[in-house]
């Protein structure tokens, strides 16, 4: 929501509009670790770490993952990717940005603990959820992820066949 030239995080949700802590966590990690210019959306996401009762959670999240690599935002791609690595050495690519550009890079969706193929009816459901939010005047960004094994570097070729997590 745009208020007094600042953006407030109103919702963080899965692909069908249900509240999703996973979508928030991934978007937060992406915003925290990317080194490009911070925009009002990044600032709104980063403000979550000071939410009452959530400070410890975001502190633990940052302790669990470290940044390994990134592909900065650019206006052609309309997304930013970060590669984070957990203490066990496993890496994941987190992609955040314009809904259409994120969805176009996804082959699957995460929903209620399952990873499902991005089929035509799924894509239509995603579009309907996003359209409703846009009609309500919201700025919507999407977040997706991809397990990367023990990778320590990413390229734009890695930004394909991701799993859409939410908005």
Regions picked out by a protein language model, each given a short descriptive name:
Residues 1-167:
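Conserved cytosolic headpiece of P-type ATPases
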